[in-house]
A protein has these predicted regions:
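Topogenic membrane-insertion module of multi-pass membrane proteins
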Residues: 1-84
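Short juxtamembrane and helix-loop transition motifs at transmembrane-helix boundaries
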Residues: 1-5, 65-71, 94-100, 130-137
Length: 190
């Protein structure tokens, strides 16, 4: 009978926290309203009115897209913090595993690939429809490059590597550029 290998709990929780930050950033970005082709001519009047939620910086605010853009940027940055900690904690506790490496890459794909790309699309609502198509294409290429980068990292990296050097641009750095733009966007708007 094959023995089941235990999962390192604390590093895995940090990796999952990274994943949750990315997922929540996508949810927050999805609440940013972008004008449609009809909305340029006719404003939408049938908006659902939910009970009033007090303004808290980590709560989605449907009426304030700027706050949602900033929250999305902050969640991506928070995901970077969890991503920086999970590998270090696993190595310090001598609990590194292939499972952890794969889970980390999947979490990174969501937090540093899909979430920044979706944020990029939602931050460009006033572009004409021809330009919005280009934004979607650029965002799609960004996600594909993130997936390829993470797959390459998983294939090239061995257990003995100490991860002290890196070939190419790390995905958190690319995501930091987009998240940083979102945070600067807030500073310029206020």
């Amino acid at each position: 009978m094959r023995r089941i290998r235990t999962i390192a709990i604390f590093p895995t929780l940090l990796t999952l926290a990274n994943l949750v930050c990315g997922f929540y950033a996508i949810v927050v970005a999805s609440r940013i309203d972008a004008p449609t082709e009809l909305s340029d001519k006719t404003p939408l009047t049938s908006e659902i009115n939910f009970r009033q939620i007090p303004k808290v910086p980590w709560i989605i605010d449907r009426s304030d897209p700027t706050q949602n853009i900033v929250l999305c940027g902050r969640l991506i940055v928070l995901g970077m913090l969890f991503d920086a900690l999970d590998g270090r904690v696993a190595r310090l506790a001598n609990q590194t595993s292939d499972f952890g490496a794969q889970l980390d890459s999947l979490s990174d794909l969501v937090t540093f690939g899909a979430a920044p790309a979706f944020l990029m699309v939602k931050m460009c609502p006033h572009f004409s429809f021809e330009h919005r198509n280009w934004v979607w294409i650029i965002a799609t290429v960004y996600v594909c490059c993130t997936a390829l980068r993470l797959a390459r990292f998983n294939v090239e990296t061995t257990e003995e590597d100490d991860h002290s050097w890196f070939n190419g641009l790390p995905t958190p750095a690319a995501a930091a550029a987009i998240a940083g733009f979102a945070l600067i966007f807030y500073m310029l708007r206020s």
